[in-house]
Amino acid sequence: SEVLPSETMAQAVELIETVEETGLVYAYAENYCYMDLTFEMWRRYREGDIGDVTYAEGEYIHDCAACWLDITYGDPNHWRNHLCPTFYCTHSLGPIMTITGHRPVQVVGFENPPIEEFYHLGHAGGHASGIEMVTLDNGATVKSIHGALKREPAQTSYKVFGTKGFLGTCADAEGEKVRLYQESATQTCAAENRYI
């Protein structure tokens, strides 16, 4: 699946148990992991350009109020109308996990205040945005933020700080790019800082 396969933790547990019992493979194809910029970040990270991750950020901001009735088909029972703010972290957190190859071992979630407009559009909880602070299996910390915060156009942003440098997405007049910073092997104050 490309979107959330479960609406509740109970459904998520049921999916995991079914996979374990049957021995089948379940593939969750989080599409933001395979976009050009995040794929390039993955490639450079795997080549060791910035060392091991020490801190990272993933951001997916999409104020979808204008298209809400279209994507929920106006159905008050549609899964999006009952989604907890921290459940849709796939676009913000998925690429960070894919880029670094590290797994979360501890997660603390927060939600921002509900958005009044979304109550009128059918969302039972006001479609608040979610934030997660995640500890990875190597001890690194990740901040993930996602949801319907007010801004246009929608934005995704990824930053990975490593033991030897930095990789991050950025946008300028020429479009979106990946920024790479690498410490010099001979002098820590001299560095390579470029767009790739």
What positions do the PLM features span?
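Beta-strand-loop-alpha-helix segment that lines the small-molecule cofactor/substrate pocket
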Residues: 1-33, 48
